[in-house]
């Protein structure tokens, strides 16, 4: 019998992505501290947090394969998180205007039964077009992306902010690299097809 699957996330976007596999899973809140360490790279941060989230659910789900994921964006070498306020969202989008912004998504598949983790970092590049202040304000007013790294939702109106998207898996930008996850699940004996 295959192990049950758990998504260690309360994100409705990650849940919708994982639903694409048409494979049964549960969700749980990992309830972890997402602070970065001094000098920690974006890649190291998202991998550490993805694994931390997955392992945080291990005690309550000791028989499960647990999926953890975390994402940050980097603008001009600086790690940018969720804006939380309209003012911060405006600042983030002004900084992104005309730039190539890299999103790093950490993915962990933790086998709570064996204690083994498979952890990766998937980059994704977003080429922003030049944005006017009015476009930024209208976008934020219409979509309110205050809990999204980088202050946009590409699955919605955010697509109008870009010239080009570049990466292995477009799902990565929304927060869950499904191509990499399928590969990890296959190593654990779970076939999606």
Swiss-Prot record:
Compartments in which it is found: Cytoplasm
PANTHER family noted in UniProt: 7-METHYL-GTP PYROPHOSPHATASE (PTHR43213:SF10), BIFUNCTIONAL DTTP/UTP PYROPHOSPHATASE/METHYLTRANSFERASE PROTEIN-RELATED (PTHR43213)
Organism listed in the record: Photobacterium profundum (strain SS9)
EC number from the UniProt entry: 3.6.1.-
Pfam families assigned: Maf
InterPro entries cross-referenced by the UniProt entry: ITPase-like_fam (IPR029001), Maf-like (IPR003697)
Protein name: 7-methyl-GTP pyrophosphatase
Residues at the catalytic site: 70
Keywords of this entry: Cytoplasm, Hydrolase, Nucleotide metabolism
């Amino acid at each position: 019998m295959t192990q049950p699957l758990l998504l260690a996330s309360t994100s409705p976007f990650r849940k919708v992505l994982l639903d694409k596999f048409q494979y049964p899973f549960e969700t749980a809140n990992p309830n972890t501290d997402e602070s970065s360490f001094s000098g920690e790279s974006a890649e190291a941060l998202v991998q550490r947090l993805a694994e931390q989230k997955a392992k945080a659910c291990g005690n309550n789900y000791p028989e499960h394969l647990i999926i953890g994921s975390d994402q940050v964006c980097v603008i001009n070498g600086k790690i940018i998180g969720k804006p939380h306020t309209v003012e911060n969202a405006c600042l983030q989008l002004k900084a992104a205007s005309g730039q190539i912004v890299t999103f790093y998504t950490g993915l962990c598949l933790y086998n709570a039964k064996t204690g083994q983790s498979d952890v990766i970092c998937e980059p994704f590049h977003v080429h922003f077009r030049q944005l006017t202040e009015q476009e930024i304000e209208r976008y934020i007013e219409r979509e309110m992306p205050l809990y999204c790294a980088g202050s946009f939702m590409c699955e919605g109106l955010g697509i109008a902010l870009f010239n080009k998207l570049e990466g292995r898996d477009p799902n990565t930008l929304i927060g869950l690299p499904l191509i990499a996850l399928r590969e990890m699940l296959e190593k654990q004996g779970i076939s999606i097809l």
